[in-house]
Every structure is written in C-alpha cells, then in structure tokens.
Amino acid sequence: MSRLLGIDLGEKRIGLAIADPGGPAMALATFRRGPAPAADAEALRRVIGEQAVTELVVGLPLHASGDEGSQAQLTRAWVEAVQPLIGLPVAFRDERLTSHLAEQRLGPMKRGRSGGPPTRAQREAYRARVDQEAAAIILQDELDARHGGVTTGGPPMGDAPETAP
C-alpha cells in the first residue's frame, strides 16, 4: 500500500502530514530544520520508514500572482538536495494561504496561564501545530486534485526530477 507524506517547508520548521491515496490527510509531526538539507533528509528517512511512505508532496510557496519567487526557488533547491538522499518521487503543490487556513482551523493561540500573553513554549507549540495543519492542507489539495475534486490551492506544480533509487 502506498502512502503520501505532505511537507510544509519553513525557514525554521518542517510540518508533516500523512495520507493513504484515498485520504484524508492527517497532521503528523513537526521537526526543526537541520543545519543542512542532509540533516533534514535523515529526519525524513526515519518518518518515511516508520510510515511506509512512497511519495512526497511538497508545498511550493508562490506569489499571489502565481509566479515563483525566491522562497519557491529555495524550496526547489531544498528538494533537489534532499530527493537523491531519500529516493522517492516528489510532487509540488501550490501552498498559497495554507498557513492562514491552518490558523483558521486551529483557532487563536491560547493565552498564558495567568491570562497574559502566551509563553514562548506555547507560541512554539502553536507554530508547530500550524505547520502540521498546513502540510495536511497541502496534501489534501493534492489528493483532491488527483481524484478530480475541488482544491483550496492552485493547480499542481509538477513533479521534481526523479532520481534512480
């Protein structure tokens, strides 16, 4: 059985979601980015092995116009560095507004214990959960597109170049 891993690549964290081809996509985990793509690939390999993943779906941050900017180029470069170390096919998916939608799904961040502003730990936990939810939205969009359904994002962005296993 094949499983898909959705990835929301951020500057500090990587949000993950998992799904069988029939869906639904479910938030899975968030981990801190490593100092280099090879460290990220190692962390992903553990998840891929545990979850029996056969394909990755990576969110591609586009401008509102649909054009690729510097963040999209950085994402593509990261995939080019990580994919040979993982050996799985990668599909790109438009990720515009996924973090905003994830925040709407999760609701506002909880206040601190004293009713004041949230603590640093609470902010970090909330951001990690947002990253997971964004990955789930990216992955669900891809699943919906593959099954002819309506998506919240844009059109599929194509596949990354495949490498020999």
Describe each PLM feature range.
Residues 2-7, 11-165:
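Phosphate- and other anionic-substrate recognition elements at nucleic-acid/protein interfaces
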